[in-house]
Amino acid sequence: MKKATAIILACLFVLVMAAACGGTENEVTPATQPSPTPAASTSTPAPATETEDEPEDDFDTDRVIAVFTREDGSGTRDAFVNITGVGDEMYIEAVVQNGTSQILTGVETNETAIGYVSVGSLSDSVKALAIDGVLPSDATIINGSYSLQRPFLVVVTDEKKEDELVQDFLDFMLSSEGQEQLGSTWTSPISNPAAYAPSGLSGTLKVGGSTSVEPLMQRMREAYIALNPDVEIEISGGGSGTGINEATSGMLDIGMSSRELRDTEKEALTDISIALDGVAVIVNVANPLTEMTLETVKNIFTGETTRWNQIG
């Protein structure tokens, strides 16, 4: 019995030792783990200093200047060529347009363009340049520091002035009520305009001519008819030359002109200034230029300067 018990204990001892040895052989010594690599930053690197600056202007100054001008007979053209000294030497390649709106559209849609329009017709679609350092404004037109300016005139024959309705409308345009229509767009040539009393007249007036004066005349018309509802006023364009010629012939009761009458025209017509207006030199809004000398304006419109990079 004792011998059997000893044998059993010996066997158990062997089994325990075998298990212990097997566990030691199968145990894996953990390998030294490498230090974790820091995760790459997901934030966007700060841009280089030069990328924070505004982009350089990409306006190509090597391009040819596209010159836009008004037609012969336009009061705006006459005032412009006389004041700048362009005279009869308008650039042969200049694109001739027959109205203010056409000039505005031409300059708005062509980055290389330059043109001129009435200050009262300016819009945000184009950029007006300072001339010799002076921008067109009510103040600079009144004090004369802005050189490109001219009067807005209505012209009538002596015969038409005798017409009661014609005279009443003329009186209205020169009155305080009429001059209020200039707003901040045009400058009044009258220091102390008189008040206007509605006449109660009726009838139809035909007024036509300068497309520069036309926007102001539309305002005058609306204000006058509000006070005299039995009056109709028909307004047409065509340019200052048309207004002068048709007023002379009697086709119009009142002509509109944005240039002074010539001596031969004064024989048949009386001119009356209803406002002062500047002529703005305009470029495309993409053009980096903000000012120009009057001499440079002349050189461009005579064709002496043909590229933007020739302007100092």
Stretches found by the model and what they are:
Residues M1-L9:
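Positively charged n-region of N-terminal signal peptides that target proteins for export
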Residues A4, G22-G312:
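Exported/periplasmic ABC-transporter solute-binding proteins
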Residues C11-L15:
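Alpha-helical transmembrane segments
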